[in-house]
């Protein structure tokens, strides 16, 4: 079976990352993974969740959303539903956990880094693109905080990135586009550190 876009089974789509895409965020990156485009930005807040108050440790959390016309047919915004949908909630938890796994939260100090991942265009792999782009934006935000003298060093223990693996018509493939993902009998995400 030939892949839809002619790639080898173990080949990623072309990746382009534009760091510093937004002017006002402490860190940001636009990641383009083939036709999937995700804007990731980080905001530093001088507060932590109540369970961390007085601990000296920081927190990293994420929000994930898809613009209504990021897809072929319009999807409704979570705000019109009055709640975060189950899929988006699962994805934002995965992004947050992936980033916390590589961060030294004690060295971050009592502050929260809020990572926003907004899908501008979706062609499969939005959550994996969001994780990879969010890491770049997070690194840039930490670099900004270090340059401002807020933190003494960049509190990251490792890099993190993600991709998908799936089986489509009996063939194992890496980095599925939407059409492949829709046909996959099995698919899963791989999140790895450096």
Q: Where in the sequence are the language-model features?
A:
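Polyanion-binding surfaces on beta-sheet-dominated domains and ring/shell assemblies
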Residues: 1-194
